[in-house]
Structure formats: structure tokens, C-alpha cells
Amino acid sequence: SIITDLQNADMVLIGGDGNHKSELEKMYEKIQMGFISPSIYFMSTKAAEVTKIALNCFLTTKISYANMLGQVLTMSGMEDEIDNVLNSIGADKRVGKKYLKYGFGFGGPCFPRDNRAFASYASKVGVDHNIGHVTDAFNEDHATFLKEYFIFKNKKKIPFFFNYLTYKPNTDILTESQQYRLCLDLLNEGHLVYCGDSSLKDQCDSRILYEKPTEQVFEINL
């Protein structure tokens, strides 16, 4: 997905002194293979660094907003309408539907790191009560909310089943995966947990079961 994203970028961000602007533009034109001409933004190295982490902080904030609203609707007895509500909000062009989906909190190697980096930098320059800190704290709380929610919903106390444990589908990255975190929390509370993907078995907790369950299971599906 990294290569695909690189070849289909919405924009290209370059930090530096601008002496090699034309060479870099030509290089990215080749990367895009002539199909797309993204907007290219040149700025100082420091400004580019801030832009990169601030962009990801915006996305984590949007993810957290969707999850916060999902919590509100769930606690109001309207969990069946979460998708409809979020799709309605996302239909407003000022908002957009990308990253506006209820589910697990953000994870992986980039979003948590960049969100904390932006929060730390903002505090360093004197902006203490910044969105980065709030978003990171909510993401932690959301993991706890989901654990309590799924345990409550599993009234039959049957084994839980995950399709995958990575932070998103079709990757092998477990870094800060809320799916894997939930799995461990459930195991630590004495629940049986099955996973449909055994490709990362050697990296995961040995208590996880991978054989096809013959009993009824409670599927973790968001």
C-alpha cells in the first residue's frame, strides 16, 4: 500500500532550501508515471516536518471524533444508526467521508507516533492544551470502551473470534494495534479467543487459538 500511495499521492511535500526544485519535480513526475500530477509544496525543512505530523494529527482527530460519536450513539441506544449518522455528516463536503468511520482506534507505526510528536512539539512551543494530547488520551479510553462493550454484548460468554489482529487488514504490523490489544485484554480476563489469521502466530500471544472453531463464537466485527 505504501508504493500505491506514493504513486497516487494527493500532494507531495518537500522540505529544503529549494535549490533542487526542478530536479525533484521531475523525479516525482516519474514516480507518478505520468498518470497523476499531484500538488507539490516546497517549504523549509522544519515547516515540512511540522506539516507532516500535523496532517496525521488531523486524521487521528477525525478518527477519534467518529469513535467518540459512535460511543455517544451506543450509550444512547442508537448503535444501529452509527453508520447512517456518520455517513450523513461525511456527506457535507466540508467534512468528507474519509476516516469518518466507527471502529477501533488508530494504531500502527505512524499515526500514534506522529500524533504524540505533534502534541509534544506544540507543548514545547507553549501550546499546552492541544488536540494531540486530547486525541491520544481518547484513543486510549476508546480501547477500554470497546473491551467493556464486547464483554457486555457477549451475554452467552462464548469464545471471541477475530478475523485479524493487525492494526488494519492486509498488513503484518501489530504495532499499537487496538485489535491485538483487545485480544490480550480478553485473554487476561479469562476469555477464549480465536483468530482466523495464523500468519503472525509466532509473534502473538501463545494463548490465542487458530484452529477452526467447532463451537459458536462471538465475532469481533467493526
Where are these regions (language model features)?
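Structural/interface elements that position substrates and couple domains in central-metabolism enzymes
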Residues: 1-222
